[in-house]
Amino acid sequence: FLRF
């Protein structure tokens, strides 16, 4: 995802 965006951070993961």
UniProtKB/Swiss-Prot annotation:
The modification Phenylalanine amide is found at F4. GO terms for cellular component: extracellular region. Its main location: secreted. The keyword Secreted applies. GO terms for biological process: neuropeptide signaling pathway. The keyword Lyase does not apply. It is found in: Secreted. Keywords: Amidation, Neuropeptide, Secreted. Belongs to the FARP (FMRFamide related peptide) family. This is FLRFamide. It comes from Hirudo medicinalis.
